[in-house]
Amino acid sequence: IDDCNYHLNILKLPELNIKKGIITFSSTLDTVVEKINENIYLYSFSQDEREKIIINFYLFKKEPTTIEDISIFLGVSAVTLKNDIKRIKKYLKTFMLNLSNENNKCLTITGDERNVRKLLLDILLKNYDITFKNDEIIITKTYYHGFFIPWKEMDDFFDKAITDKAYKLLKGILKENNKNISDEAFKVLFFYILVLLNRYKDHEITTIKNMNFLSNTPEYQGVKEFLKEPEFSEGELLTLTEYFLGSNTFNFDHSFYGNWVQIETFIMQL
């Protein structure tokens, strides 16, 4: 307790208290994370933390981030960062993606947009959760990837206007198709629609495989009915339809969803 309070004092946070054998703390986890990030120079990152930070930086940060910026933020040498990047590239290959050094300064995650979205979806599902109150969605953090990934940029995915629109679209499509799904499937579809709404203007999906099959499904008609905006391409409508068709497999935990992504990726490689 004394050691914890020592570090809390450095961060100018309230101390832990023990009363009748119960530890109490008057602050919140979000406040602690905010304070730690303000004093990030005091922290030494583990290898796993560094790799998660790098992936999320290049997925979510909107402004260009140079290799030097990452090295300074993480407080590591160029050699250490190079080894981290090698491991990250190996991980990204499971999503058929790459970390490209196009101008010798900034790294970019490259690959098919559908695979980029699968990685985004996988990260959002692990790091955020949803609950419902008075027919509204409440978004909370799980901190699965730790406290130092770019939370602010990730939180932008949950802008209230976009969140409300995604929720309305999902409920409308489910009602149109008279479809009941599990809570896990609802979360997957809701988060995918958020990814779609955040990315389609700059990273549009125009064509996908099995277009004829997908366009003749009832799910497609429901998607098309509620995504009437002309800016949505046929590829976007059909990709969302594909997720709805797969929603019956989203009945387990996130690891099951992750396996589904990996299996589909493996099949695409054949």
Where in the sequence are the language-model features?
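A cross-family "folded-core" feature that marks the main globular domain of proteins
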Residues: 1-270
